[in-house]
Regions:
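Contiguous beta-strand/loop segments that form the cofactor/metal-binding neighborhood of enzyme cores
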Residues: 44, 48-134, 167-179, 217-220
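Short, mixed charged/polar active-site loops
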Residues: 91-93, 124, 152-157, 182, ...
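Short, hydrophobic secondary-structure boundary micro-motifs
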Residues: 17, 63-65, 128, 184-186, ...
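Predominantly a Rossmann-like dinucleotide-binding segment in NAD(P)-dependent oxidoreductases
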Residues: 1-76, 207
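C-terminal helix-rich "cap/oligomerization" subdomain common to oxidoreductases
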Residues: 89, 137-138, 172-220
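Short polybasic amphipathic segments
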Residues: 116, 132-151
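Active-site loop of classical SDR/Rossmann-like NAD(P)-dependent oxidoreductases
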Residues: 158-170
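Active-site rim elements
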Residues: 38-40, 157-160, 179-183, 187
Length: 220
């Protein structure tokens, strides 16, 4: 759904973006190596949302992040439940709420999801990210409405992140290695995603809004 959304943004179907949100109510499986660090959610899960914001909208000017610990994660950590907002030079905002608590456990019913929404001057789009249903096969979704196409348009597909990413993003990386070319999403660009993640942690630690340029070298 992120690639479909990127197409809508690039073709100006939604006009100029005004606000983007991601709302995650899902419980990740924390890999053992993450338990060795005090940094948890943004490095282990939120980084995917940070990367999505950068893929869709580019680098933010400023980042503000707040967090609390996750009651379910019994090991020491700083960030369990997080909320971070990216502010751009043109006043656009993108914000994500990453709620990894999400469920008070049995016997309560579950309501697990990841929803996203982008509002623009000419239209809006919304959808879901399907991975929380894994191992059940649950494709991500998108639908949009715009001044050019007022009725909801909702394309569908049956592919999911795993294993179908091996035919998409991952195959692009493998082709680049084989051909000696720059991949569509490069490691050089990913360094800037890490800078955004570190800006989130600096915002938490220093309790302030952090300019991304504080984390980048002048040549970056």
């Amino acid at each position: 759904s992120m690639r479909a959304l990127k197409y809508l943004l690039d073709t100006k179907e939604l006009g100029d973006p005004v606000l983007a949100t991601i709302e995650m109510r899902a419980i990740p499986h924390w890999q053992e190596f993450l338990k060795q660090y005090d940094k948890l959610e943004i490095f282990g899960m939120g980084i995917h949302h940070v990367d999505s914001f950068r893929f869709l909208f580019g680098d933010p000017a400023e980042i503000t992040c707040v967090c609390r610990t996750d009651p379910r994660s019994k090991f020491p950590h700083v960030d369990g439940i997080t909320q971070y907002t990216f502010k751009y030079e043109n006043d656009f905002m993108a914000t994500s709420l990453d709620d990894v608590w999400a469920w008070p456990e049995d016997p309560c019913e579950k309501d697990i999801y990841i929803r996203w929404r982008v509002e623009g001057t000419e239209g809006m789009a919304e959808g879901t990210i399907g991975w929380p249903m894994y191992p059940d096969r649950c494709p991500s979704t998108i639908r949009f409405t715009s001044k050019r196409h007022p009725a909801w348009v909702a394309p569908q597909w049956d592919t999911v992140w795993f294993p179908d990413a091996f035919e998409g993003t991952m195959s692009g990386l493998l082709r680049a290695v084989e051909q000696g070319t720059e991949p569509e999403i490069s490691a050089r660009d990913n360094v800037r995603t890490i800078a955004c993640v570190e800006a989130c942690y600096r915002s938490i630690r220093e309790k302030r809004t952090v300019a991304l340029k504080e984390l980048l070298l002048p040549t970056d």
